[in-house]
A protein has these predicted regions:
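N-terminal nicking endonuclease/strand-transfer module with a His-rich metal-binding environment
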Residues: 1-196
């Protein structure tokens, strides 16, 4: 997890505005994506951390699990989930990114193959069947539990515009990081956004 950054916010107290810090967290992964090996290595370390990737989505099953978690397919509080980039199907969103990014290269590769068995029919499927990660996930959180504890739902939903700006900025600043889906969770104490 990246070290929380903070920005100033103003709070009205005793007839005057006072400045306070608003925490900003940029998580590069979570235990739900961490491989069994990474969990085992981390468990053996005093710090509980590992240098092994834990933001990687390693196969189609992991991607399906991310879809269920991020979209709360198992929950009745779907009204507290907002997808602001992509659709309500993260698996298809990732497949679409693969098509957009790799289809031309796949066709060119296939045109250069003399043997049919070396041609790639579906690049997403090929990566899923390999040992390579198929996607990764980051989490952006603005504010912390102390900040959000006393905020009502209407105030929380104002964050949609802020998170939209975060996605636009990420696309602009890191254009090679392709975003398939961005979903905000308002169902926890501190709203946060999952980006795949």
């Amino acid at each position: 997890m990246a070290k929380p950054k903070s920005s100033l916010r103003r709070k009205f107290k005793g007839g005057a505005f006072m400045e306070q810090e608003l925490a900003y967290s940029f998580h590069l992964g979570s235990d739900k994506n961490k491989s069994k090996l990474a969990k085992k290595v981390a468990k053996g370390n005093v710090s509980g951390t590992t240098s092994l990737s834990n933001n990687a989505i390693q196969n189609a099953k992991d991607l399906s699990d991310v879809n269920k978690h991020n979209l709360r397919d198992y929950d009745n509080q779907r009204e507290l989930i907002r997808t602001i980039y992509g659709t309500n199907d993260i698996v298809n969103d990732v497949k679409q990114v693969y098509l957009d990014e790799f289809e031309e290269a796949r066709l060119e590769y296939n045109n250069n193959q003399t043997r049919e068995d070396r041609k790639i029919e579906d690049y997403f499927k090929k990566v899923c069947e390999s040992q390579n990660d198929i996607a990764c996930e980051i989490i952006i959180e603005l504010g912390d539990m102390d900040f959000w504890n006393d905020k009502d739902e209407r105030y929380r939903f104002k964050m949609i515009d802020v998170y939209n700006e975060q996605v636009k900025s990420l696309i602009k600043i890191v254009p090679t990081f392709k975003i398939a889906n961005a979903t905000i969770h308002f169902d926890e104490v501190s709203p946060h956004m999952h980006i795949v």
